[in-house]
Amino acid sequence: MKVVYGVVGEGMGHATRAVNVIQHLLGRGHQVLVAASGEGAPALLAARLGGAATVRPIEGLHLSWRAGRLSTRQSIRDNLALARARWRLNDEVLTEADDWGAEAVVSDFESLTAFYARSRDLPLLAVDNCQALVRLDHRAIGGTGGLPGVRGARAVTRARTPGADHYVVTSFFPAPTRRPRTTVVRPILRPEVLAATRAPGAHVVAYRSSLIDALLDALREVPEVPFKVYGAGRVGQEGHIELCAFDDARFIDDVRTARAVIGGAGFSLMTEALHLGVPMLAVPLAGQAEQHLNTRWLTHLGYGQGAASVDAPTIRAFLGRVDAYAAALEAYPRGDNQPAFDAVDHWLGRRRDDPA
C-alpha cells in the first residue's frame, strides 16, 4: 500500500517512534511518504530512513511555552502569523500525496495528515502515546480531572486526529480502554534500547532541556553523588558533575548503567528508563497534562517519584528509596515492538482486503 505517515515535530519522541514503525512498514513491502513538522523531526527521519522513504517537511501547529508552561494565547498568535507560508508548503505536500496515489494515512499526533485523510476519504490510523489521556481509563490514579492544564490538553488531543478509524495507543501503565476502536500496546522503543542490558553503577543521569540552571544548582548541593548531565548545552567536568555532549549510543549506555535517572516526564525518556529497569525522578513541565499523567502512573506503580521542582533534599530522599523502586521495576512488562507492529499490520491488512 501507499501510506502517508504524519509525524508531529513537538519534541523528538514522536519522530523516534515513527522511524521504527516506518521501517517496519517498508520491510513489509509498503511505500511510505512521510510528512513531518518541526525543526528537527524531518532531518532525523530522513537520516534514519536513509532514502528508503520520501520525507517532506510540513508546517504543523506550533505550541508556545513560557516559563515551562503552555501559553495558549501565544500559540494562537504564532500560528496565525505563520498561516500564509504554512498553507503554501502544506498544499505542495498534499498535492504530492494526491499525485502519488495515497491509499491510507498513519498519523503520530499530526493534524495536517489527519485532515488530509478525512478530506480524501482515506482510512486513518492514529499511533501515539498522547491519546492515552482521553482514550484510557485512569480511575486507578484518581482520574485526570485534577491534572494541570488538562482541559486544554484534552481539546488539543482530540483535535489532532479526530475521527480516526482506529487508535493504537502506546502506554507503560495498565490502564484499560474507555473508548471503542482503541488498541493499547507497550511503548515502541529504539532497537538500541531493546538490545541494551542493565548494569547498575554509582552515577545518576540527569537530562533536562529546560530550566537546566536550576537543575545544576541542585546537583551541586549533592557532592556525594556523581552525575552525568545531558541537555546543558556545553561539555566539561565540574567536580562531581560531568556535562555530556549528546550522543545516542553513549546516552543509552549511561542510562543502562545508571543508579537512577532525573529528568522531565516526557514519554520517551521515561519509557526507555523503565524498560532498562532504572528508577526515575520525574519533573513534569508545569501545565503539561500528559507529563503529569505519566508522573502519576510512575508514582502509583512504584517505579519512581515525581517532583514539581528539584532541590538537594528531594534528590537525596529519592535516592534513599531507589532500591525499592528498582525492586518494583523487576516486574515491569518488558518486550519488543512486535505487538505494536502487529496492530498496525492488522489494521492495514483490513484496509487492503476491504478498501471500502
Model-identified regions with their sequence ranges:
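A donor-sugar binding/catalytic signature common to diverse glycosyltransferases
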Residues: A104-F109, D254-L293
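Active-site-proximal region of nucleotide-activated glycan assembly enzymes
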Residues: P123-V184
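Donor-nucleotide binding loops and adjacent catalytic segments primarily
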Residues: I22, R186-A260
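C-terminal amphipathic helix plus adjacent low-complexity
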Residues: R316-A356
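Nucleotide-sugar donor-binding patch of glycosyltransferase catalytic domains
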Residues: G143, A245-F246, P279-Y325
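A short, glycine/small-residue-rich beta-strand->loop->alpha-helix junction that serves as a flexible
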Residues: V7-V19
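Conserved nucleotide-sugar phosphate-binding/catalytic loop shared by glycosyltransferases and other
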Residues: G9, G27, V32-R84
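Conserved nucleotide-sugar donor-binding subdomain of glycosyltransferases
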Residues: S71-A104, S111-L112
